[in-house]
C-alpha cells in the first residue's frame, strides 16, 4: 500500500500495519522491487537545502534533492541528529516524509513514534493530517526483512515523488544494518565472503537501493541516511561503499562528543559537493573556509598545548586558539528533540544568521566575550546576551 493513507502509520516490510490501528485503507499498491529512474529523467538543478543546524548548513551544506550520510560510531548522536532533521524539515518545509527504520533498536523506533506524536508530526486525532509514514524492520526481524525494508521505504517515497509530484525527504536509519542483513543472507545462501567478511555482492546491493533514492524532474527526494561506522573506522567496506553514492557526508566525532559539544559534527571531516563559491556564494564559501582553517590550525597546535602549554605559543597562535575554541562552542546547538536532556529550548538557526555569527567571530569582533557564552546557543545575538548575563552574575 502507498499514498496518503500510509501517513501517520507504522508498516512492516510487507506494508502491513503494526501499530494496532487497523488495516491501511489504500486502493493503490506498488511492488517494492522497482527499477531506478532513467538517466534522462534525473534532475540536475543545484540548490542548498537549509536544515537549521548551524554546523551542517555552514561546513557541509545539503543539496536539495541530494543524498546525505550521517557517519558515526556507537553513541555519538546519529539518531538524535536524524530525528532533529525530521523535526526541522517537517516544521520548516511543511512537506511529507518517509522514515525507514532498518535493523535498529525497537526502543528507538518507539521513541521516534512518541516524539512525532508529541511534536504533532503525527496527528493522533486526525491521522490523515500526519506528515510522515514510518516503515520499520527492526533488529529482531529476520535478515530478509531487514534487507528489504529500505526498498519498502523507497517505494512509499517514490509514490509521493512520481504521483503527487512532491518533494519528499526519506530518512533511513541505518544503512549499515542493511549491509549487515545482506551479509547474513549471503552467508545463508552459501556464498564465499569477501573483504572483512562482507558479502561479495556488497556494491551491487548498495547500488540497487541507492540508485532508486534520487530526484527526477517530477519531484525531489532529499534523503538523509545514518551510517554506523564499525569501530570508528571510516575505511571499513560498509561506510566506504556508502559514501561513494552521497552528495554530502556529515561525520560525527567521538572527540567532540567527549567534550560535550553536540551535535558532535566534525567540520574538518565532513564534506559536501555544494560548498563551492558558484553554488553556495562567495560569502558562505569564504566563511566556511575561514572556520575550517582556524579549526585546522587549532588541531595542529594541540600537541604543543598538551605538553609545554599555552604560554609557549606565539601571540598570533594564542588568538587563533581562543577563536577556535569559540567557534567550536558556537557550532554546538540546543536541539528540539533533545530538550528533555539539555533543559534548554531547541533552536532553528537560518543560514544567513549562521554566516553572520561566524563573520563576527573570525576577524575578532567578539574576542572580549568569554567562550562559555557561545556554548549551546542559537544565533550570535543569543551569545552576546548570554555573555552579558554571565558578566552580571560575576559582578
From Swiss-Prot:
Known partners and oligomeric status: F-type ATPases have 2 components, CF(1) - the catalytic core - and CF(0) - the membrane proton channel. CF(1) has five subunits: alpha(3), beta(3), gamma(1), delta(1), epsilon(1). CF(0) has four main subunits: a(1), b(1), b'(1) and c(9-12).
Origin species: Blechnum occidentale
PROSITE patterns linked to this entry: ATPASE_ALPHA_BETA
Subcellular location: Plastid, Chloroplast thylakoid membrane
Lineage of the species this protein comes from: Eukaryota, Viridiplantae, Streptophyta, Embryophyta, Tracheophyta
MF annotations from Gene Ontology: ATP binding; proton-transporting ATP synthase activity, rotational mechanism
Annotated protein name in UniProt: ATP synthase subunit beta, chloroplastic
Any coiled-coil regions, as ranges: none
Domain of life: Eukaryota
A biological process from GO: proton motive force-driven mitochondrial ATP synthesis
PANTHER family listed in its UniProt record: ATP SYNTHASE (PTHR15184), ATP SYNTHASE SUBUNIT BETA, MITOCHONDRIAL (PTHR15184:SF71)
Topology in membrane: Peripheral membrane protein
Binding residues for ATP: 72-79
Keywords noted in UniProt: ATP synthesis, ATP-binding, CF(1), Chloroplast, Hydrogen ion transport, Ion transport, Membrane, Nucleotide-binding, Plastid, Thylakoid, Translocase, Transport
One Gene Ontology cellular component annotation held by this UniProt entry: proton-transporting ATP synthase complex
Keyword Nucleus in record: no
EC number, as in UniProt: 7.1.2.2
Function in brief: Produces ATP from ADP in the presence of a proton gradient across the membrane. The catalytic sites are hosted primarily by the beta subunits.
Main location: plastid
Catalytic activity: ATP + H2O + 4 H(+)(in) = ADP + phosphate + 5 H(+)(out)
Sequence similarity: Belongs to the ATPase alpha/beta chains family.
Pfam families: ATP-synt_ab, ATP-synt_VA_C
Amino acid at each position: 500500500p502507498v499514498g496518503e493513507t500510509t501517513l501517520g502509520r507504522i508498516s512492516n516490510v510487507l506494508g502491513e500495519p503494526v501499530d494496532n490501528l487497523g488495516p491501511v485503507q489504500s486502493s493503490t499498491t506498488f511492488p517494492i522491487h522497482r527499477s531506478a529512474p532513467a538517466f534522462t529523467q534525473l534532475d540536475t538543478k543545484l540548490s542548498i537545502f537549509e536544515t537549521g543546524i548551524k554546523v551542517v548548513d555552514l561546513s557541509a551544506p545539503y543539496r536539495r534533492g541530494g543524498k546525505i550520510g550521517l557517519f558515526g560510531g556507537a553513541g555519538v548522536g546519529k539518531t538524535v541528529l536524524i530525528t532533529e532533521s525530521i523535526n526541522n524539515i517537517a516544521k520548516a518545509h511543511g512537506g511529507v516524509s518517509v522514515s525507514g527504520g532498518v535493523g535498529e533498536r525497537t526502543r528507538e523506533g518507539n521513541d521516534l513514534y512518541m516524539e512525532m506524536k508529541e511534536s504533532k508530526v503525527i496527528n493522533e486525532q486526525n491521522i490523515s493530517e500526519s506528515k510522515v509514514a514510518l516503515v520499520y524492520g527492526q533488529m529482531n526481524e529476520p535478515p530478509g526483512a531487514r534487507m528489504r525494508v529500505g526498498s519498502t521505504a523507497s517505494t512509499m517515497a517514490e509514490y509521493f515523488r512520481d504521483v503527487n509530484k512532491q518533494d519528499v525527504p526519506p530518512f533511513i536509519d541505518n544503512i549499515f544494518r542493511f549491509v549487515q542483513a545482506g551479509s547474513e543472507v549471503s552467508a545463508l545462501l552459501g556464498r564465499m565472503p569477501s573483504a572483512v567478511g562482507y558479502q561479495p555482492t556488497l556494491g551491487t546491493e548498495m547500488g540497487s537501493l541507492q540508485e532508486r533514492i534520487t530526484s527526477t524532474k517530477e519531484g525531489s527526494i532529499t534523503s538523509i541516511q545514518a551510517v554506523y561506522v564499525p569501530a570508528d573506522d571510516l575505511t571499513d567496506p560498509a561506510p566506504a561503499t556508502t559514501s561513494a553514492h552521497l552528495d554530502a557526508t556529515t561525520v560525527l566525532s567521538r572527540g567532540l562528543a567527549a567534550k560535550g559539544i553536540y551535535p558532535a559534527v566534525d567540520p574538518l571531516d565532513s564534506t559536501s559537493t555544494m560548498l563551492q563559491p558558484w553554488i553556495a556564494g562567495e560569502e558562505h564559501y569564504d566563511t566556511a573556509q575561514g572556520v575550517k582553517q582556524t579549526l585546522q590550525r587549532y588541531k595542529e597546535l594541540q600537541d604543543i598545548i598538551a605538553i609545554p602549554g599555552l604560554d609557549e605559543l606565539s601571540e598570533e597562535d594564542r588568538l587563533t586558539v581562543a577563536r577556535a575554541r569559540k567557534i567550536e562552542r558556537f557550532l554546538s546547538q540546543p536541539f528540539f528533540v533533545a530538550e528533555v536532556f539539555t533543559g534548554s529550548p531547541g533552536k532553528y538557526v537560518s543560514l544567513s544568521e549562521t554566516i553572520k555569527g561566524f563573520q563576527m567571530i573570525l576577524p575578532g569582533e567578539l574576542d572580549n566575550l568569554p567562550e562559555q557564552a557561545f556554548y549551546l546557543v542559537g544565533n550570535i545575538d543569543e551569545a552576546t546576551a548570554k555573555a552579558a548575563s554571565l558578566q552580571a552574575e560575576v559582578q
